[in-house]
Every structure is written in structure tokens, then in C-alpha cells.
């Protein structure tokens, strides 16, 4: 008799994805982030569900309902802060996951990579809408500024913005629809993640060497289940340290002031994980140009596979490529810092230089360095 794990139609899918899955024997801790993202998503859906039980999406009561969750609901404070800081952990894992993909050339799995980019956009949209829900000053003005960017689209821009707002300004209709979208999007993300995995399992995982590992595979369980649990414990420890010791570290103090359309905060800025894109947006003096640069800062990832010129897949044996990759990381950290600074000298210039460098590395320098390395290996 066949094992039920291998014969049952439903259990078989789980078995082939998480138990008997043939995995390369040499994948490092950088391959942990996929499973960590899955855990983050489940954590966000569960904490979000419990928050939604007590939250009211009405401009008059939204701020008070969040305060009520923190003060009066049993363990409401920990649920709220796990959800808020869980989003930060989600993005840390996302950036590490994408960085791993760029470093080790995982982007050559085109379908998996493109679904991943779509996932990144969807998660960013979800996080943005979630930030609007507490209806503090930064929520309101963040929503106003970011949705207003769409007005840069020629001809239909203004109508589009008012259609999204459900009126002539960010108001009750906007908050209600943002809550509805914020609730439904994580389930769409779950479906996309399943498709992401489906495409990944068509080809099998990449590995640090970038060479086919078909000749040396090991079962996912117990080897990588144990390895993933270690990563999970480290992540949960970091998350709970943040939640229990400094829950407001990554938040904005302005969001503890109820939304007031008549008073603009001195410095409008998004959450830390959007600051790099926000800095690129601000570095271009033209509104439409800024919006295009903002979208391109993520969409540029879709062009990365087309610009791969090296004969080697990953950067493990490519010192020039490695230098360029870490320069890109440093540049993104610089952009993140600039995005949180007020608009003024010298931050404007630094932001513009960092933005130029960001696009130059990906679109110009990486393909050139790949070709140079190919030539050097011939000598």
C-alpha cells in the first residue's frame, strides 16, 4: 500500500512542495527568506484579522478605534505592534530575498522572477493602504501626497485621483475603500505566492554556485525544514524584541496626532521601507518624471534578466560583480537615509547623485562589468 502522504490528492501537493521536494545540497541561509516571507504573510493575515474585529473604517472613529485596541482589547497592544512591526520584518525579508536573487542570478528563472516583482508591487500597495488606516497625521497626508502623484498622468490624471478618493479630497470614502483593499490584498498575495512556488518548482531551486545541482539533491525535509526553523527563530526573536522593547522605533510620532486636513506636518515621509523610492521620486524636479522614476525604481528589476551578459550565473566567482552589488546596497541605504531627510541642501544633491548611481549600476555598469569579466577569463 502506498503511503497516504504520496497518494492522497491534497496531501500529495504538500508532500511534493515541503517534504519530498528535491533541493540542492549546498543552498545557504540566503535561501531561508522565502519561507520567512511565508511566515510573515501568515502572521500579518492572523494579526490583521484580529485587528479588523475591533477597527472601524470611519474618519470619525478610526483613530479612536486603534487607541481602543491598544488600551481596552485583551492583548490588543501586542497584536497591533506585531502587525505594524511585522510589516517591517516582511520588508526586511523581501529586500534580502530580492538581493539574493540579484546576487546569485536567480532572475534567470523568468516566470518566478516576474511573479516575484508583481508580489513586491502588491505587498507595497498593501503596506501603503495599511499605513493610512490608523488615520493619524502621517496616514492622512501620506495618502494625500501619494495618491496625488497619479494626477501627473496626462489627460486622465485628475479624474483618476478623484475616482480613487471617492470625492474631492482624501475623506471617509477613501478610508473605507482602503480598508476593504487592505483586507483583500493579502489573500491575493497568498494566491500569487502559490503561483510563485509553482513556477519555482518547475525548474527547481538555484544554488550559490549557479551550476545545475541535478546530480546532487537532498529531500527538503528534514534538512531544510530544520534550517528554516533556525531562521524563523532568529526572525521571531528580532520581531518580538522590537515589539516588546521599542514598538514605536520605526514609526512616526506624527501618526499619534489625529488626522487634520487643515494642518500639514513639517515633513511628510512614508514608512522606512519606502524611503529609497521616495528619495528617487523627490530627486526629480518634474512631477511626471518623478512618478515615472518611482515606478521604474522597482520595474527596473524586470529588465535585470535581459541585461545579464556574464557567462556565469551568480556573483560567487565574480569579484567585479560583487563590488558593484555591494555598491548598489550602499546606494540603496544612502537613498533610504535621504528619503527621511528634509528637502534642502545638501540632501537634494546627494539624493540626485544616489538616484543616478542606482539606475546606472543596474542598467549600464552591471552589463558592462559582466562583459569585462568574460574577457578577463579568456586571458
From Swiss-Prot:
Name this protein carries in UniProt: Cytochrome b
Cofactor note: Binds 2 heme b groups non-covalently.
Function text: Component of the ubiquinol-cytochrome c reductase complex (complex III or cytochrome b-c1 complex) that is part of the mitochondrial respiratory chain. The b-c1 complex mediates electron transfer from ubiquinol to cytochrome c. Contributes to the generation of a proton gradient across the mitochondrial membrane that is then used for ATP synthesis.
Family that this chain belongs to: Belongs to the cytochrome b family.
More details: Heme 1 (or BL or b562) is low-potential and absorbs at about 562 nm, and heme 2 (or BH or b566) is high-potential and absorbs at about 566 nm.
Ranges that cross the membrane: 33-53, 77-98, 113-133, 178-198, 226-246, 288-308, 320-340, 347-367
Keywords for this protein: Electron transport, Heme, Iron, Membrane, Metal-binding, Mitochondrion, Mitochondrion inner membrane, Respiratory chain, Transmembrane, Transmembrane helix, Transport, Ubiquinone
GO cellular component, one term: respiratory chain complex III
Cofactor: heme b
Membrane topology of this protein: Multi-pass membrane protein
Entry-linked SUPFAM superfamilies: a domain/subunit of cytochrome bc1 complex (Ubiquinol-cytochrome c reductase), Transmembrane di-heme cytochromes
Gene expressing this chain: MT-CYB
Amino acid at each position: 500500500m502506498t503511503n497516504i502522504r504520496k497518494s492522497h490528492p491534497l496531501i500529495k501537493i504538500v508532500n511534493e512542495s515541503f517534504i519530498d521536494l528535491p533541493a540542492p545540497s549546498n543552498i545557504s541561509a540566503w535561501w531561508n527568506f522565502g519561507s520567512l516571507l511565508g511566515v510573515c504573510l501568515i502572521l500579518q493575515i492572523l494579526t490583521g484579522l484580529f485587528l479588523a474585529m475591533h477597527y472601524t473604517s470611519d474618519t470619525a472613529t478610526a483613530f479612536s478605534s486603534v487607541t481602543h485596541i491598544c488600551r481596552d482589547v485583551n492583548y490588543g497592544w501586542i497584536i497591533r505592534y506585531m502587525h505594524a512591526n511585522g510589516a517591517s520584518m516582511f520588508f526586511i525579508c523581501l529586500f534580502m530575498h530580492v538581493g539574493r536573487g540579484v546576487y546569485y542570478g536567480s532572475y534567470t528563472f523568468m516566470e518566478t522572477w516576474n511573479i516575484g516583482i508583481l508580489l513586491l508591487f502588491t505587498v507595497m500597495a498593501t503596506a501603503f493602504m495599511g499605513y493610512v488606516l490608523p488615520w493619524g497625521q502621517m496616514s492622512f497626508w501620506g495618502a494625500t501626497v501619494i495618491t496625488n502623484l497619479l494626477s501627473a498622468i496626462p489627460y486622465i490624471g485628475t479624474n483618476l485621483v478623484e475616482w480613487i478618493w471617492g470625492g474631492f479630497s482624501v475623506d471617509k470614502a477613501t478610508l473605507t475603500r482602503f480598508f476593504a483593499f487592505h483586507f483583500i490584498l493579502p489573500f491575493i498575495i497568498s494566491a500569487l505566492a502559490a503561483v510563485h512556488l509553482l513556477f519555482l518548482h518547475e525548474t527547481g531551486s538555484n544554488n550559490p554556485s549557479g551550476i545545475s545541482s541535478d546530480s546532487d539533491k537532498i529531500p527538503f525535509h528534514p534538512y531544510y525544514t530544520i534550517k528554516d526553523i533556525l531562521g524563523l527563530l532568529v526572525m521571531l526573536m528580532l520581531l518580538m524584541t522590537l515589539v516588546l522593547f521599542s514598538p514605536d522605533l520605526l514609526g512616526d510620532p506624527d501618526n499619534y496626532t489625529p488626522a487634520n486636513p487643515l494642518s500639514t506636518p513639517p515633513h511628510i515621509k512614508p514608512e522606512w521601507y519606502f524611503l529609497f523610492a521616495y528619495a528617487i521620486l523627490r530627486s526629480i524636479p518634474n512631477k511626471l518624471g518623478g512618478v515615472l522614476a518611482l515606478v521604474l525604481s522597482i520595474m527596473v528589476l524586470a529588465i535585470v534578466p535581459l541585461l545579464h551578459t556574464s557567462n556565469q550565473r551568480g556573483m560567487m566567482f565574480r569579484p567585479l560583480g560583487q563590488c558593484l552589488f555591494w555598491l548598489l546596497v550602499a546606494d540603496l541605504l544612502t537613498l533610504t537615509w535621504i528619503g527621511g531627510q528634509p528637502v534642502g541642501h545638501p540632501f537634494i544633491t546627494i539624493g540626485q547623485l544616489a538616484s543616478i548611481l542606482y539606475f546606472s549600476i543596474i542598467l549600464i555598469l552591471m552589463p558592462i562589468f559582466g562583459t569585462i569579466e568574460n574577457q578577463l577569463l579568456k586571458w
